[in-house]
Regions:
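Transmembrane helical cores of multi-pass ion-transport proteins
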Residues: 1-398
């Protein structure tokens, strides 16, 4: 949430608002059992451009409200069925691509180099590097303490994924990611005073401090509808609605593929939920929300059984920001990086590549094109490239 807010150059609390609304309001109305919604990295470029064109964040929030109305209309018109036509190979490629991006993006954080905001998935980064050059650049800024915390977190996550751990009555109630974070905090405290190992504050979770009602009010922004007579305003609102809806439909299709129970989500209901969520975000200063594949896959991998897990996640996020900011500020980014890298490995297993290859070149090419284009651009461009390749094969087979 915070990393995306930083990448969008908006108040940090705007990301928190989006995470809370996405986790509670959207989840309540959602047509998916496991989808988790929140601010999306894929909308970063649109947010930056839109704020620049409209001249203020408040005017942009008004566009988010109207975008939410458009999404509700799309849901009523049953536009959610579009997601059913996305080729399976492209969905698999999207998941594998996200997994690789997660791994590449989190390696610098694991080593204690945090120039690129946590949560930013764009190829071209805010610090002027790209996803690959960052890996070379970080070598000069390695933090030994961060590496130790990251490796310990990895060890905990690997052990927590073993059958003996999952079958034990006591251990099975202790989620691996939670233990990794707890041990990360303890090691961070233990390293204090040791110059070589001590973790600098810039390598720790950074939350906005809300100490009073006045602080809360200062972090809330409200929409300015004075631009409704401007054609740019409506173009931005419509663009937001379409892109956010496409990301959501892609996310829902991906979640259904990951769902161990193979539930089929109601995509039209999901568009309605996203619309309601974006209207709420726009009215109190939150970034636009979509279904977020990384959050959703982490939700499934953590053993979620119902919508309640997403609601609890968002509630804890809100409580933590309001009541426990000092405790959360002790969490090392390297612990979180280890958790996300493990999620990435689960999304991009070698078996997925072998499976797509066995299905033949007509399945493998859209899959691998989706992965490659995603790595050097973004999710939507990768999916569009994969769909185009899949369509070419369909036309070729029917000539």
């Amino acid at each position: 949430c915070l990393g995306i807010a930083m990448a969008c150059k908006v108040p940090l609390f705007s990301g928190i608002i989006a995470g809370v609304i996405g986790g509670i309001i959207v989840t309540v109305f959602s047509g998916s059992k496991y989808s988790v919604s929140g601010p999306a990295a894929g909308l970063t470029a649109i947010v930056l451009t839109s704020i620049s064109q409209l001249g203020s964040y408040e005017a942009f929030l008004a566009a988010v409200v109207i975008a939410g109305v458009f999404q509700i209309i799309l849901g009523v018109l049953k536009a959610g069925s579009i997601g059913n036509y996305i080729p399976n190979s492209v969905i698999k490629g999207m998941l594998a691509g996200i997994g690789i991006i997660l791994i590449i993006k989190q390696i610098p954080h694991l080593f204690g180099y945090d120039k690129d905001p946590e949560g930013n998935e764009q190829f071209i980064q805010m610090d002027g590097e790209n996803s690959f050059t960052e890996l070379v650049h970080m070598i000069n800024f390695i933090t030994p303490g961060a590496i130790i915390i990251g490796l310990v977190s990895f060890a905990i996550l690997i052990i927590a994924d073993k059958p003996f751990y999952k079958k034990d009555k006591i251990l099975s109630n202790l989620p691996g990611p939670l233990l990794a974070v707890v041990f990360g905090i303890l090691l961070n405290l233990a390293f204090k005073g040791y110059a070589l190992l001590e973790i600098s504050p810039v390598h720790l979770v950074n939350l906005p401090t809300i100490a009073s009602i006045t602080d809360l009010q200062a972090n809330l922004f409200f929409p300015d509808f004075s631009f409704v007579n401007n054609s740019k305003f409506w173009i931005i609102a419509f663009t937001l609605a379409i892109v956010a809806s496409l990301e959501t439909l892609l996310g829902i299709e991906a979640v259904d593929k990951l769902d161990p129970d193979k539930n089929e989500s109601n995509t039209n209901k999901e568009l309605l939920a996203q619309g309601i969520g974006n209207i709420a975000c726009g009215f109190i200063g939150g970034l636009p929300v979509t279904s977020v594949i990384v959050r959703s896959s982490a939700n499934i991998n953590s053993g979620a059984k119902s919508k309640l897990s997403a609601i609890i996640h968002a509630t804890l996020l809100l409580i933590s920001v309001l009541l426990l900011p000092n405790l959360l500020a002790l969490i090392p980014n390297s612990s979180l990086a280890a958790i996300l890298i493990m999620t990435g490995f689960k999304l991009t297993k070698l078996t997925i590549f072998k499976e797509q290859w066995k299905f033949g070149f007509e399945q493998f090419l859209p899959f691998i094109v989706t992965v490659i284009v995603m790595l050097v651009s973004d999710l939507l461009k990768g999916v569009c490239a994969g769909i185009i390749v899949a369509i070419i094969y369909i036309i070729k087979d029917n000539i």
